[in-house]
UniProtKB/Swiss-Prot annotation:
Present with 131 molecules/cell in log phase SD medium. It is a peripheral membrane protein. The modification Phosphothreonine is found at residue 646. The gene is MSC3. One of its GO terms (biological process) is reciprocal meiotic recombination. Residues 33-171, 236-261, 300-335, 363-403, 422-454, 495-514, 561-728 are annotated as: Disordered. GO terms for cellular component: plasma membrane. Keywords: Cell membrane, DNA recombination, Meiosis, Membrane, Phosphoprotein. This is Meiotic sister-chromatid recombination protein 3.
Amino acid sequence: MVFGFTKRDRRVPDLSRYDYYYQNHEDYNKSPQLSAAAASAASAASPDRTNYSRSHSLVSHAPSIPRQRSSVKSPGRRLSTSSAAPPTSRAAAKQYSQKTYSLRSQRSGEYHLHPPGYTTNGSRMNSMTSGANVRRNYGKNKSTAGNNNDSRANSITVKTTQVTDPSGRTQSITKKTIRKINGYEYVETTTTTKNLVPLGDSQRHFDEFSENYMLQDDDILEEQASDNIHDIIEENETDNEKPYSPVSESHLQDDSELNVEKPDFPLGSYFHHKYSTDVMPLEEESSLSNFSDALDYIPPTHQTSSKYIHNKRKQASTTRRKKRPPAVKNAEAEAKKPLTEAEMYLKALEVAKRNVYHTDAASDNASAPLGSNKSRKSRMGQKMTLRSSSDSPTATANLVKSNVEVQPKRFTSSFFSRNTKSAPHEVHNHSVSTHFKSNKAVDPVPEPKSANTGLTDKEMYDQALKIAQARYYNSHGIQPEAVDNSTTAAKPRQVGVSHLGSTGSIPPNEQHYLGDSEIPVQSEVHEYEPIPLQKTKTTGSSKNKFKTMFDKVLQFSQENYGYQHKKEQGEQTPVTRNAEESFPAASISEGVTTAKPSSNEGVMTNPVVTDSPSPLQQQIDSTTASSNGQSQGNVPTSAVASTTRTRSPELQDNLKSSSSLLQDQTPQRQEDATDPTTSSTNELSAAEPTMVTSTHATKTIQAQTQDPPTKHKKSSFFTKLFKKKSSR
């Protein structure tokens, strides 16, 4: 029970339905004593009526007080008045804080329980209460008031009232603090008014857009107006043509005083409307015209330069000017008349052509009448079309004459130089927008619209290609003849590989080379260095590709381990068998002896000795020792001989083609390399001899077959054992 009572005493009652705005303020005292005092203050007390006291504050017990108005502005102890009605005026636009102090007895609430006319002997009351609270508290029990006197002692009550305007902004905050000490109430009222904007500001800002600001713009123009009437006319031609409507008679008088010299214009002209004073004001025309110039309004600034007026005049409309052409008959005004858009375009085109072609000849387009129905093309259309509008005979002749002086400075196109056979005196034009036909070079006739139908697709393509080349050469300043010579010199020479022997007779057992003759060869270290070869492009089926891949795997395993030569002997093709049968016969008849392999700096070389070696063979033998990776000195001679005879047809074709390329001594740079591991020094390439026999000569080349670089594995016990067995 004790635990429950203590918990109930510390519990704060929920007063959010009465004072929900207290929760958002930090200075609100949320102690349980305050809530208990507020609950006890809600119940009225009725002590003995004979005792009375004076109250120096007028308190209203009506519902929430939206606004408070003070009758005395000076701070200190004063009579504070609370009212439920809204004020008729607002305070000045500044923040101020007022505090009022009042002393009131706790028994002052007894007067709220009776009608306003009920009084006792000798009782005085200096406070007035509203009738709403009196009617509400009139029928309450009197005996329940005296029991709560002790609970109301020594308590503090804070009440805060916040007043907002319809737009949601805070206007004033009133904080009322009531301290009850020893039966007395100390009332402290603090009012903070936040009126940042006066009353009429919003309405004044809204009314600014309903006025006419035509006179303000005209004043800016009139300050810089000169005495010459023609300058005024020139300014008014490009001015924004807004309806002129005065606001008041004072502005009309100022306007008439500034414009002393007013020209006499016709009644229907534009300038008569500009300077006339009998125009209906803008506000009187319609209700919608009040905001017609809201977008055109420019706030007046202190900058009155001509640049400001020029930027404002860019908004002038051209349609109004066409409807009301100026009726000025003065010669100077006609001389200063602004150009139309078409005339400006023609002048700009003439200047551009003069800058491009470096000539002073005027363009024919400028002299053309404006009313001509000749359709103009845009610059993008002229660039994208092959046949430009300057193909007419007059334009072509003028452009040819204009380029006579500039001709030595430019390069001559090979396409246009072909026409010199028929007309040697004619000077050809190198401009981008003109071209000539190759079949008619004397007098070009303007083509009809259906001229494209007479050409075939191939002819049109050829002409377009020539025109594009000529334009490219002219734009980059390249001489086409030099380009043709450089392209012919840069083309790779076609190497004709001869597959015949020295006498031209081929034995029936020799293989013919049918692959591509242009094999990319890489020689970066020396001219006669052994060159790594790439696999030729096989045009066979996927089965052949799989075969070559399988041969590569066998070759790699054979070169690295050296004990798989027996497996490869059973996979020989019939073509290689025929070639193998010819190898012993040729070697026996010509006395070819195979020397034992000797390792030189870790590189195995297998030279083939012949009776009369050729000079090319001596050069090849002198360059066979290269810095390649792995030594194969432990492979026996019989294994080398067997591996030499077990070459696939693709590899033999590669070796034959490489020998023919070395004969011609025309090494080319490798461009279409497919293996990314190709470099000038291959780490794991093995040098093996291959004998290609013919009727009278035996040529030997030491080819390097490319293998992908692999990491060297440590030789295990089994690999050493297999190597020992193979060496035995």
